[in-house]
């Protein structure tokens, strides 16, 4: 399992008492008196001895990639002269440092000591330990590609500023071809084959992926979305088109832009995108729910507003506000056509913090109003909500807003009583996972992130479990091909579940196991997967490039 790390720094300022000056005055008086008794030639207390010089460097230790730079700072006390000189203790082979304290690491892994020395008192110095990281290359251990199709490989190179790799196929031309950009073209038969990425900075470091050829895989579309976006929604309409709405725009340099109100339609027949809408409000982290009358309810996005899209007119119409503002919530279509909206987070003073809520409400399409129902047992955001075959709703996991950060809590909502009851806890706290109701009524819960904000620790799950409503229990863990969170899970027409991150797996309920399938060509940090009427799956988000799994 891969690890997510966080680092915190606390800086404290302390006020020093001025009583030291009074003590010095008494000392000077005593010296004068003793001097007078001894018949000295002066009654002057004399000049106080200068304070000793000390030098410190910040930070005292750090890690740096090969060839990268790092800025150090120095502090000198006990003397008005703050001038210092910088040096590398191990010499030129261990890197260099400028007079301003900017260190540049060598192209080799090692431990280095950066030394700062006082100009006023060269006998005073301090040093910082620099760990120059070793180069590493990583690829998925196993990847899938379609027979005769293409597959984009992305190698992760760490420990150096040089991220370039050289690609090769262990089996030579019989195993296909691969470009300098990592685009693999598979043969029409055979396999598995082995694709290797070797670091340009350190050719001794490489990684190899076993490529399994399958009948299914991803294909990039010739047309792109009208606006690159993420944190949007993508909803299959009764006419077979897909409504893509809102989200956060992506700038030309790949950075995040602004919340958008724009919307567009994807037509599977022509595989093109056309404008519709826009929404009445810009929003991201919202939820779109297809109602029984064919319209789409759009709720939240860290606000309390809601609106309905009508495919017949191509327009959005605001409806009554929700009881509470929320984003990263869930919205579940109940058997009677109403919508359960649960949990999520609201805005707070810290834009980067999560403020989960436990409140829940129901939207009634006939009155276009929201009514509060019983709260969930726990606050939750980025959780999941799965409608079970008998009509109840399983709510699981999510960010809790308190230690440890993620939770293993689960709850069951009963539409008849409009209330939640505690459910069987997940086998491991998690958020940003997926939960998919299978055709047999069980629920596949896959991946997710565990975060312990109190101990600054966390990891990503590479396993999945199956919840059985009949017994309120979970199956043993099933291994996926990679750790995943913020991924997608889509129920296919044949009853299998397509789980996609940087690679793709198919979960077979009959065997309760995962098998590799052709993977995506685009590396998406945030994606929306929409099953089309013909069984294919549309992928959008993080870029204007769209793909179809078929």
Residue ranges: model-predicted function:
Residues 26-56, 122, 129, 203, ...:
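Bacterial Sec-dependent N-terminal signal peptides
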Residues 109-121, 190-202:
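A short beta-strand micro-motif common to beta-rich folds, especially ectodomain repeats
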Residues 87-102, 168-183:
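Low-complexity "stalk/linker" and mucin-like segments enriched in Ser/Thr/Pro/Ala/Gly
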Residues 101-108, 182-190:
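Solvent-exposed segments in extracellular or luminal domains encompassing
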Residues 152, 214-550:
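Kelch-like beta-propeller repeat domains
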Residues 51-53, 132-137, 213-217:
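Extracellular interdomain linker/stem segments of modular secreted and single-pass surface proteins
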Residues 4-24:
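Bacterial N-terminal signal peptides that target proteins for export
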